[in-house]
Amino acid sequence: MDTAELVALLHLASPALPIGAFSYSQGLEAALDAPLIRDADGARDWIASGLADVLAQGELPFLAHQLARWHAHDAAALADANDEFVASRESFELRRETEQMGWSLAQLCASLEWGDAARRATLASIPSVALPSAFAFAAAAHGATPDAALAAYAFGWVENQTAAAIKAVPLGQLAGQKIIVALREPIRDAVRRALATPPEAINTFAPQLGILSARHESQYSRLFRS
């Protein structure tokens, strides 16, 4: 990986990226209300489970295959796969989350003129673009390798989940950093598994997450949009 690729991926994984990630907890807030999470250890275990059972089996392999489709510029396959991913979201909140963040990232890519004009036009033509599809476009535009792109996406997800836990549990900053350190190796494992997953083996089945997300829609007190 050269320095330019590294800096581009650090940018994409940054919490300062203006796509609204800070406003979502992806079920973590509902898990606190259940209560399935009570402390730092519970938060770490919850995030680790989401990484291994949700991201590694679904979102990350989908991202890897979308990255390959962007390199090949297979517009039809990109749109079809994006539609399937959006349809796999198990609640209104989770669907709205990926669509809002995907739209925001797509707008950013267009404004910054990342990638070539033809691929930007393809990105703009995808209705309800999901976050992994837009992230794959941005990663491809910067020449990122699949393993590096997936690692950046997974780290950004872990960091955002940890930030949500710090606010909602609540946890101290040091406790949050310990969670991130503990999940470094699991991130590597998740990326390795995702890269070995063929399209037909992608699994987005996450019933507990879907139920918690649906409950969150009517939860009495909320800090987050999911």
From Swiss-Prot:
Its domain of life?
Bacteria
Its main subcellular localisation, reduced to a broad class, is cytoplasm
Q: Which InterPro entries match?
A: UreF, UreF_sf
Q: Looking at the UniProt record for this protein, which Gene Ontology cellular component terms does it annotate, in alphabetical order?
A: cytoplasm
User: MF terms per GO, please?
Assistant: nickel cation binding
Which key words are in the record?
Chaperone, Cytoplasm, Nickel insertion
- Fetch the Pfam families from UniProt: UreF
Localisation: Cytoplasm
**Does this entry carry the keyword Cytoplasm?**
yes
Per UniProt, subunit arrangement is: UreD, UreF and UreG form a complex that acts as a GTP-hydrolysis-dependent molecular chaperone, activating the urease apoprotein by helping to assemble the nickel containing metallocenter of UreC. The UreE protein probably delivers the nickel.
Describe the function of this protein.
Required for maturation of urease via the functional incorporation of the urease nickel metallocenter.
What PANTHER family does this protein map onto? UREASE ACCESSORY PROTEIN F
Q: What's the protein called, per UniProt?
A: Urease accessory protein UreF
Species per Swiss-Prot/TrEMBL record: Burkholderia mallei (strain ATCC 23344)
Encoded by which gene?
ureF
